[in-house]
Amino acid sequence: MAGRSGDSDEELLKTVRLIKFLYQSNPPPSSEGTRQARRNRRRRWRERQRHIRSISAWILSNYLGRPAEPVPLQLPPQRLTLDCSEDCGTSGTQGVGSPQILVESPTVLESGTKE
């Protein structure tokens, strides 16, 4: 791993193997049985997954001294926009964050209506 010493690489690999083992110890539930039984198995599986996720975060923070999630990306104070002055295609939207509904020409809309 670039920029790290060999010792911390070994520790990181050991930690990743441990976390991988935790996730592998909780396979997805089977799809057999009644709807209620399947629902209960999925609910218990999701609860175990949440528990494994919290244990993994604890392992990462305590043994490696780093948070489980990366540090959030700091965005510039001004809004990010895309310049659509060039050909942007015919997707029916313009710009970012302001979806436009693609409107068909009136002749197409009128062809199927009876007045």
Swiss-Prot record:
UniProt region (Disordered), positions on chain: 23-48, 89-115
GO terms, biological process: mRNA transport; viral process
Chain coiled-coil ranges: none
Motif Nuclear localization signal and RNA-binding (RRE): chain residues: 34-50
Comp. bias (Basic residues): 36-48
Principal place of residence: host cell
Residues modified to Phosphoserine: 5, 8, 91, 98
One Pfam family it belongs to: REV
InterPro entries cross-referenced by the UniProt entry: REV_protein
Assembly mode: Homomultimer; when bound to the RRE. Multimeric assembly is essential for activity and may involve XPO1. Binds to human KPNB1, XPO1, TNPO1, RANBP5 and IPO7. Interacts with the viral Integrase. Interacts with human KHDRBS1. Interacts with human NAP1; this interaction decreases Rev multimerization and stimulates its activity. Interacts with human DEAD-box helicases DDX3 and DDX24; these interactions may serve for viral RNA export to the cytoplasm and packaging, respectively.
Name of the protein: Protein Rev
Organism: Human immunodeficiency virus type 1 group M subtype B (isolate MN) (HIV-1)
Organism lineage: Viruses, Riboviria, Pararnavirae, Artverviricota, Revtraviricetes
